[in-house]
Design a protein with these regions (language model features):
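Conserved beta-strand termini and adjacent loop/short-helix elements that scaffold enzyme active sites
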Residues: 54, 93-95, 162
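Catalytic cores and adjacent binding grooves of peptidoglycan-active enzymes
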Residues: 104-167
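Secretory targeting and sorting signals
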Residues: 1-29
Length: 167
């Protein structure tokens, strides 16, 4: 409920504050809602998002698993937004499991997922998102209108969700 309320009130406050003189920007509080494996699976399943792992498991501490434990709700809703907006098949191959690069906006901290590189989703990203500078490791990136980042890592898309993408 708190998460839903936050999603409704933040944009309203931002619009109202934007109309007041001297106010430039309102930032969302950094409080995040972390989801369990079961909660995330249920939300993904509801819109037809699938997931797979080379290890056939969901244990967060095993790198060959695909885990959603401690994933941010904005990441889950961002993936759902991509699915519904694009109409493409989405298969998640990487979540919050160990083995990814560290950092504030990392897989482990719930901000990132990896998805299979299907033609449909690639075409959608290339058509509707803005090409930006390559990532530090050389991979090309696109930014959505809401500011989320989609990096083409060759075999999959590495997506960083700062927000739910207009959910």
């Amino acid at each position: 409920m708190k998460s839903v309320l936050r999603r409704v009130l933040i944009p309203i406050v931002a619009v109202v504050a934007g109309l007041l003189p001297g106010v430039v920007m309102v930032e969302q509080a950094s409080a995040l809602t972390k989801l369990s494996q079961a909660q995330a699976e249920s939300l993904f399943r509801a819109v037809g998002i699938t997931w797979s792992s080379s290890g056939g498991c969901t244990n967060r501490n095993i790198s060959t698993c695909t885990s959603f434990a401690q994933i941010n709700d904005t990441t889950v809703y961002g993936a759902r937004t991509l699915k519904t907006a694009s109409g493409c098949a989405i298969n998640i191959t990487g979540g919050t499991e160990t083995g990814h690069a560290s950092g504030t906006y990392s897989h482990w901290n719930g901000y990132k997922i990896d998805i299979s590189k299907y033609t449909c989703v690639g075409n959608y990203i290339h058509t509707y998102f803005t090409r930006i500078a390559n990532r530090g490791d050389g991979y090309p990136q696109w930014r959505s209108g809401s500011g989320n980042i989609y990096a083409d890592e060759g075999s999959h898309w590495d997506i960083t969700y700062y927000n739910c993408g207009g959910c």
